[in-house]
């Protein structure tokens, strides 16, 4: 979108020019700054003589330049009082000289010579000085010689001056073009000039005066048709980001276009942009509704240097690129030219800049530059076929068959909005819709142009960047909109069977004959011989099966063929067909020659029948950012022509395709790759969801579960098999105990309540007690049915009878102790508390080892732990004798089984008796499931099953 190499402040050393004192004279009288300003106010024209100390005298006739602004600005009540008629121009053989005499302290001028440029200003003592901008000397050069010419001869110089570089005359067509410019000064400029509106207007007109001197050699006239000064603050966001500021101003420019017509618009500011940027502009967008314009910084007190920055950015709008540093690639007659990437005193156009400008004119970038601004409507001639100021349309001198235009008044009819142009729909008399193709591509290296829906004109012609690969081709390059394909050119001349000839055929181009050459001189008709390095760029050598060419009129073409051999055996004969027509000339090459862009060596391509390095061509070609992110191609002015769905200078943002030069290519963004995937997955999800609902409702199947089962089985998916330990039951929770017959599938469970080891309210540290190890409790079995005998313990008949009688006398549920093991003749018994078998026979006693064995074990243990071991060989002393027993008294405590000896003193008094808690009168609640299970218990069958399992 924008110039990728912005104009930046020069990093070269500070320029310290000499100051050349001069004396100015008018009509033989010496002038002071005040008297010169007074002379300019009283005389619309005067002859100025510049006298240098070295005796050189220069004569320049100056005339007031009233074409710097149009009549609409002078007639505007808000600006007419601020227009100063103090800007003069003088035309000589060396160019256009500019002089502004609005204030004695602000005199500014630009004087041109063939080899130098001088700035005219005043010194502190009130005298005049010349400041050289190119050669640091005071030699006025060619100005001295031109002063000998007569006044009437100099005054007639109103066209391109002969002293301009020769390449300007070679590339430009000599037609004069007019640029209608809108210039806006932001609030920072207004404050810089003391918030004085008149000073700002004088400075803007002074800028236009010097700008016209710089564009005068190119035969381009720039006129200020609209100006604005933001006196109450900026109307847009002016920030250090130059790119964002440029985009903001382009949006504001569209608002200005609603009330004022102009070709391009620029914003002037004093704000310093990031990275030292002093100017930024869109490239190749002159006459564009959306992007014709730019911004620049008033960065220097020297007006000439600031205007050079303005001229640089305006050159980008014309399609000019930065000058390369290689003088062999791009010729510049002075050390620095205007399109140099670094700012400074640059007042000359390089050969590359002129070529870029001529290329833009050939593509129609100047379609809006032929109407002369300031021309009065009364000067227009209705019926001449040219839309002039004051006319809305002009359908020519003959009968007007355009129903959108009134041929007698040259006005639009009714609600018509346009009457001509490639983007005007003559059926509706309105601009064609946006993204309508108005100029189709004529080859693979050309690009389509589109209407923007706002204007009736088609954009200028743009094409693929020079030296870029032809789309879809290998080793064939684009140049000036054409593809350098030898095969395609041969097929164009000879039909479908035509293709590039053998490599040996091109050796004939060094002979300079009809069968091989590098073209013919258009003036002398002399056949030119190719140099050896250019042999592949001369006459196109084709291979075909056709008898004659299919291109051109038979009377205007000539063809022939020759024979070559690729080996010494002469058994592989090749035919080389050549073509010559009368269609070639000065401006168009002969179609029988090798097309520009054809490969002629490694990283080399043909241009103008000469083989050039591709790198040399790329140096003078505008480059695109980031290779357009592989979403488009780079056009000839360095802007990306994007695919559908993308936009921006590098196709990095969503957009409508196309480019800022060719306009948007589509009316809607279309479906991008990301949106395609999004829509696909959404539709797929809806389909799967509907299918699952259908199977769930209609066929009672869960497709998700079935699919997941198949996936787990197919890919062997499973979770981590980590055993999970069950948490212990909470306090006072019911604990279910299984019967020992549960392992055989007979579960006789009962429910018991676990009592806490500590009081419920002991949670604080003060209530904590040391652990207490109680003896194991006796398992209890709850029996509800008194008619069923307890499975344990096994009782003899007498005990069973006593037990039955006791059950008969008690009606409530009782708890019976369960023995730890069965009293049977079996080898082992089952422990209902621990759930394990224990042997019924006591284990044999283990005898105590002897003292020697124990001593040996202790010694080994001491060695293992590196401890000292002392063997005791001495006899241990005998224990003291027991005290004699005293005779028993009445108060003495008798021994019980000689287990302990009571102390002689009386025992302490017993603790006070506490009332025992009353037993609950309500019977404990027993689970109904457990009761139901107990009713089915059969002790005999259980014992039989148990014995059977033990036998196995």
Swiss-Prot record:
Metalloprotease that cleaves and releases a number of molecules. Negative regulator of lrp-1 protein levels, potentially by influencing its endosomal trafficking. Involved in regulating the molting process. Residues 798-809, 849-873, 925-938 have a biased composition (Basic and acidic residues). Residues 379-466 form the Disintegrin domain. Disulfide bonds join 287-368, 330-352, 332-337, 438-458, 624-634, 628-640, 642-651. Pfam families: ADAM_CR, Disintegrin, Reprolysin. The peptidase M12B domain does not require a conserved Zn-metalloprotease consensus motif to contribute to regulation of lrp-1 protein levels. It is a single-pass membrane protein. Disruption phenotype: RNAi-mediated knockdown leads to suppression of molting defects in a nekl-2(fd81);nekl-3(gk894345) double mutant background. Residues 905-914 have a biased composition (Pro residues). This is Disintegrin and metalloproteinase domain-containing protein adm-2. Its main location: membrane. Residues 694-952 are cytoplasmic. Residues 620-652 form the EGF-like domain. GO terms for molecular function: metal ion binding; metalloendopeptidase activity. The active site is at residue 313. Expressed in hyp7 large epidermal syncytium (punctate distribution), seam cell syncytia, anterior epidermis, neurons located in the head, tail and central body, proximal oogenic cells (levels increasing in maturing oocytes) and myoepithelial cells of the spermatheca (at protein level). Not detected in mature sperm cells. Residues 778-809, 829-938 are annotated as: Disordered. Keywords: Cell membrane, Disulfide bond, EGF-like domain, Endosome, Glycoprotein, Hydrolase, Lysosome, Membrane, Metal-binding, Metalloprotease, Protease, Transmembrane, Transmembrane helix, Zinc. Binds 1 zinc ion per subunit.
């Amino acid at each position: 979108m924008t110039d990728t190499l912005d104009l930046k402040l020069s990093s070269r050393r500070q320029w310290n020019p000499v100051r050349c004192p001069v004396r100015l004279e008018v009509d033989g009288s010496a002038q002071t700054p005040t008297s010169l300003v007074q002379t300019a106010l009283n005389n619309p024209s005067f002859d100025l003589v510049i006298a240098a100390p070295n005796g050189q005298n220069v004569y320049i006739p100056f005339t007031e330049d009233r074409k710097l602004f149009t009549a609409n600005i002078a007639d505007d009540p808000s600006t007419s009082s601020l227009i100063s008629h103090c800007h003069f121009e003088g035309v000589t053989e060396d160019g256009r000289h500019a002089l502004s005499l609005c204030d004695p302290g602000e005199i500014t001028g630009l004087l041109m010579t063939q080899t130098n440029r001088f700035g005219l200003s005043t010194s502190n003592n009130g005298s005049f000085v010349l400041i050289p901008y190119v050669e640091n000397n005071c030699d006025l050069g060619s100005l001295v010689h031109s002063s000998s010419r007569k006044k009437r001869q100099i005054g007639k110089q109103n066209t391109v001056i002969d002293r301009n570089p020769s390449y300007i005359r070679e590339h430009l067509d000599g037609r004069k073009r007019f640029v209608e410019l809108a210039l806006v000064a932001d609030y920072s400029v207004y404050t810089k000039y003391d918030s004085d509106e008149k000073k700002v207007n004088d400075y803007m007109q002074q800028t236009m005066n010097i700008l016209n001197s710089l564009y005068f050699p190119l035969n381009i006239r720039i006129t200020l048709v609209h100006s604005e000064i933001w006196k109450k603050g900026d109307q847009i966001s002016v920030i250090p980001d130059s790119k964002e500021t440029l985009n903001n101003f382009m949006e504001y420019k569209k608002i200005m276009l609603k009330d004022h017509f102009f070709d391009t618009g620029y914003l002037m500011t004093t704000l310093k942009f990031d990275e030292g940027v002093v100017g930024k502009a869109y490239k190749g967008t002159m006459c564009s509704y959306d992007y014709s314009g730019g911004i620049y910084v008033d960065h220097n007190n020297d007006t000439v240097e600031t205007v050079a920055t303005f001229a640089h950015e305006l050159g980008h709008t014309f399609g000019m690129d930065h000058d390369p540093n290689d003088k062999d690639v791009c010729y510049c007659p002075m050390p620095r030219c205007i399109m140099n990437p670094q700012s400074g005193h640059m007042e000359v156009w390089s050969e590359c800049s002129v070529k870029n400008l001529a290329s833009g004119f050939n593509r129609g970038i100047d379609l809006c530059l032929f109407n002369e601004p300031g021309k009065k409507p009364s000067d227009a001639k209705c019926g001449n076929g040219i839309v002039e100021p004051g006319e809305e349309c002009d359908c020519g001198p003959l009968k007007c068959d355009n129903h959108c235009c009134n041929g007698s008044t040259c006005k639009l009819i009714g609600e018509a909005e346009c009457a001509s142009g490639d983007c005007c729909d003559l059926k509706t008399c309105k601009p064609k819709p946006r993204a309508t193709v108005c100029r189709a591509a004529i080859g693979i290296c050309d690009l389509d142009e589109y209407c923007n829906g706002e204007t009736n004109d088609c954009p200028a012609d743009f094409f693929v960047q020079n030296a870029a690969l032809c789309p879809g081709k290998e080793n064939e390059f684009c140049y000036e909109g054409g593809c350098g394909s030898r095969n395609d050119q041969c097929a164009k001349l000879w039909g479908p069977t035509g293709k590039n000839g053998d490599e040996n055929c091109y050796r004939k181009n060094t002979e300079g004959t009809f069968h091989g050459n590098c073209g013919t001189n258009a003036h002398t008709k002399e056949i030119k011989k190719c140099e050896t390095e250019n042999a592949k760029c001369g006459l196109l050598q084709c291979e075909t099966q056709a008898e004659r060419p299919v291109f051109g009129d038979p009377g205007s073409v000539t063809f022939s063929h020759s024979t070559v051999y690729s080996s010494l055996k002469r058994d592989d004969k090749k035919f080389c067909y050549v073509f010559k027509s009368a269609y070639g000339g000065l401006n168009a090459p002969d179609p029988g020659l090798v097309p520009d862009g054809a490969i002629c060596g490694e990283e080399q391509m043909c241009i103008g029948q000469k083989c050039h390095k591709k790198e040399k061509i790329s140096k003078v070609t505008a480059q695109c950012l980031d290779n357009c992110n592989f979403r488009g191609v780079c056009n000839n002015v360095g802007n990306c022509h994007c695919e559908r769905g993308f936009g921006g200078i590098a196709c990095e943002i969503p957009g409508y395709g196309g480019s800022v030069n060719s306009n948007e290519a589509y009316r809607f963004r279309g479906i991008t790759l990301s949106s395609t995937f999004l829509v696909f997955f959404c539709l797929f999800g809806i389909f799967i969801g509907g299918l699952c609902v259908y199977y769930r409702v209609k066929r009672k199947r869960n497709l998700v579960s079935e699919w997941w089962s198949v996936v787990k089985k197919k890919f062997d998916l499973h979770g981590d098999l980590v055993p999970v330990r069950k948490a212990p039951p909470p306090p006072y929770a019911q604990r279910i105990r299984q019967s020992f017959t549960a392992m055989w599938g007979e579960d006789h469970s009962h429910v018991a309540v676990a009592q806490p080891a500590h009081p419920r309210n002991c949670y604080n540290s003060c209530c904590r007690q040391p652990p207490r190890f109680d003896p194991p409790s006796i398992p209890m079995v709850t029996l509800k049915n008194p008619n069923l005998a307890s499975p344990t313990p096994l009782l003899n008949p007498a005990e069973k009878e006593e037990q039955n009688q006791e059950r008969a006398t008690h009606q409530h549920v009782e708890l019976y102790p369960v023995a730890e093991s069965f009293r049977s003749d079996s080898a082992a018994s089952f422990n209902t508390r621990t759930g394990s078998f224990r042997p019924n026979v006591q284990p044999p006693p283990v005898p105590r080892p002897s003292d020697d064995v124990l001593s040996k074990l202790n010694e080994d243990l001491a060695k293992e732990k590196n401890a000292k071991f002392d063997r005791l060989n001495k006899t241990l002393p005998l224990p003291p004798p027991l005290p004699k027993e005293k005779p028993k008294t009445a108060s003495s405590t008798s021994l019980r089984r000689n287990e302990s000896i009571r102390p002689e003193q009386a025992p302490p008094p017993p603790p006070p008796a506490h009332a025992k808690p009353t037993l609950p009168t309500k019977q404990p609640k027993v689970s109904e499931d457990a009761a139901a299970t107990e009713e089915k218990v059969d002790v005999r069958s259980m014992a039989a099953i148990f014995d059977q399992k033990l036998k196995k």
